[in-house]
Amino acid sequence: MKIAGQVSLADLPRVCPLLCRSDDSEYGEDKTRVVEVRGVRFGDERPVVIGGPCAVETREQTLNVARAVRRAGAEMLRGGAYKPRTSPHGFQGTGADGLRILKDAREETGLPVVTEAMDTRHVEQVAEFADMIQIGSRNMQNFPLLAEAGRAGKPVLLKRGMAASLVEWLGAAEYIAEQGNLDIVLCERGIKAFASGEYSRYVLDLNVIPAVRAHTFLPVIVDPSHATGVASMVEPASRAALEFGSHGLIIEVADPTTARPMCDAVQAIGPETLARIARFAHARSSSAVEGVSCA
């Protein structure tokens, strides 16, 4: 029985004609599109490591973390200037001031910056300061925002919605691609399940990594910080994600010399842990995934 609005992986060629793998595509059955962000190449042989604070709180805090993640081996800097919070009473970020701090951090460290745009009104401003625009989990199906990000002329990091199927996730990416922008990197960041919150923040869906690689030519990375919500789990989750073929990682890092982070402090790792993860990542090839496939 056909149900209105129901789609499956079999519908991908119709739902995502721009991003779905096909025999006549230049990417064929197994090639990945390389998305370049100021010299950092997603989808290439070497997995990319992105590190930085959950939120840009102060100039000192952000610059300290930026220096630390660069020393640890990260290739890009993350940090939220605009913050989507569960409660309106939580810290909402530093906005435009935070974007300027991120720009200063990039100029000092040389690390390209990825940060989130939460609203269509923010996209132009974020694109002015950042090298890559992030669309967060809560906005994965904010279709006007996706289209605006696609028109901004910058690569886009699209996080999976916490309750989104693979088809819905790729359908969201198609909104960006329809604007003529194929420089999209997908990010698995954990999904909600019956056990969510019992012993981890979300459930890290490792199985989706080979599925993404089988059905689209876009690179896919993993956010082990939000997926686990526990700092001690971030390193093993990172290793597992790379074993499953992730093209990279985006990880929250705290500066131990400054105050406790205002957001998600318990999931932030220290620079030493990031350095171990980076060494593991850079010793691997994201294109050689033994024994992991999704027909």
Outline where the language-model segments fall.
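Non-catalytic terminal accessory/regulatory regions of metabolic enzymes
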Residues: 1-49
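Catalytic beta/alpha-barrel core
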Residues: 94, 110-122, 131-144, 155-166, ...
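Catalytic alpha/beta core domains of metabolic enzymes, predominantly
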Residues: 37, 42, 152-257
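Active-site mouth loops of central-metabolism enzymes
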Residues: 47-64, 88-92, 112-116, 136-137, ...
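Conserved beta-strand positions in the central sheet of alpha/beta enzyme cores
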Residues: 10-21, 78, 114, 134, ...
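N-terminal small/glycine-rich loop or linker at the start of catalytic domains
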Residues: 32-54, 85-88, 213-222
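Glycine-rich, proline-tolerant flexible connector loops at the mouths of alpha/beta enzymes
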Residues: 78-96, 255-265
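Alpha-helix-loop-beta-strand connector modules within alpha/beta enzyme cores
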Residues: 91-115, 149-155, 206-220, 244, ...
